[in-house]
């Protein structure tokens, strides 16, 4: 690798991308993504939470108590900012992800920007069974996150 190569995890690259998105609002350069609401667990704690911790001054993160309320708060923020700034909502895999479905549908129906980052299932079956990981037992490629395809 060359001297100018930057090595990042996928989560670090994603967070870096989010931190570098800007929009002009009234001739003032503002961050497009104002912050993150998150509940961290398996599927996002060891990657995304760690990456967000590194940029907490640039992209603040608030821990929510319920996934749906976090996503709805993100929608309210976008609406109050006239769709010019966006909040991010993240959760672990399973019921936490499905709790954000109603808010996702609401944002879609009202054309309000919201970025939802749902946790992912484990890449292998060694930790099986995982607490609250929803998946199809006959087809491990089908997960709770597939419910977001419609919205």
Question: Where do the PLM segments sit?
Answer:
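N-terminal alpha/beta PP-like core and its mobile active-site loop of ThDP/TPP-dependent enzymes
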Residues: 2-151
């Amino acid at each position: 690798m060359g001297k100018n190569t930057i090595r990042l995890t996928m989560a670090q690259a994603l967070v870096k991308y989010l931190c570098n998105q800007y929009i002009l609002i009234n001739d003032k350069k503002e961050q497009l993504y104002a912050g993150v609401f998150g509940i961290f667990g398996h599927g996002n704690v060891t990657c995304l939470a760690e990456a967000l911790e590194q940029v907490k001054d640039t992209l603040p993160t608030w821990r929510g108590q319920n996934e749906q309320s976090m996503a709805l708060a993100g929608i309210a923020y976008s609406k109050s900012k006239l769709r010019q700034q966006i909040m991010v909502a993240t959760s672990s895999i399973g019921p936490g992800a499905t709790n954000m479905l109603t808010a996702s549908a609401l944002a879609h129906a009202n054309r309000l920007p919201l970025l939802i980052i749902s946790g992912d299932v484990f890449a292998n079956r060694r930790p099986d069974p995982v607490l609250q990981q929803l998946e199809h037992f006959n087809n491990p490629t089908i997960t709770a996150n597939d419910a977001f395809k419609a919205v």
